[in-house]
Amino acid sequence: METFFLTFIGLLLFLESWKTLGFYIESRLLGYITLLGSVPLLIGLFLWEILKLEMIGYSILGIPSGTAIMLSLVLYFALWTFYFISSALTHLWSYNSRLLGFISLIIAFHSLIIFGIPWTYTEQQVTNGAAMFMSITGIVLGIISTMRFFQLAVPFRYITKMTGWFSVFGSVILLLVAQGI
């Protein structure tokens, strides 16, 4: 199930990065596409929580005592889903994007948890491969969301291009990690 979420998050970040780089002329088109891409994330989040993670698909973190790590993953993907829905509505209705910057700050703090929490378990509970995949995901998404905070909430307009390129390459890394799971 992590593959599903990381693939959609990577694709939506890839699309938003082209807007950050200035290649989209119409902001509403990005809003429609992001809203359309957020629907599977929202449905997957509800299905993942309702079906209690066993019936949907393969999970790399199949541990009996890992409720804290699973809850943190569900919260993390819920934050990203909320970010993309907020981003879609911001682009559709041409609102100010400072709110997206502050949501990115919350996601950046939670990325630190996702980066560090798998290393607190033993290797019998979480394998080194799963911990590595989660750590790569946490650090890549943490860097992207921190840069988005400094670009959107605090108006540092000089880092716009750098944020766009980090989002492009980070989303490609995220897609490769998702396919590696």
Tell where the protein language model's regions lie, with residue ranges.
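N-terminal topogenic module of multi-pass integral membrane proteins
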Residues: 1-64, 157-161, 179-181
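Residues within membrane-spanning alpha-helices of integral membrane proteins
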Residues: 3, 9-10, 37-38, 77, ...
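Cytoplasm-facing juxtamembrane segments at the starts of transmembrane helices
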Residues: 23-37, 92-110, 127-133, 150-170
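Hydrophobic alpha-helical segments, principally membrane-spanning helices and signal/leader peptides
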Residues: 1, 29, 66, 71-73, ...
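Hydrophobic alpha-helical transmembrane segments and adjacent interfacial helices
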Residues: 14-17, 38-57, 84-91, 108-122, ...
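Membrane-proximal helix-loop-helix units in multi-pass membrane proteins
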Residues: 72-143
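Long amphipathic alpha-helical segments with strong coiled-coil/leucine-zipper propensity
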Residues: 50-88
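Long alpha-helical, hydrophobic tracts
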Residues: 3, 8, 22, 70-77, ...
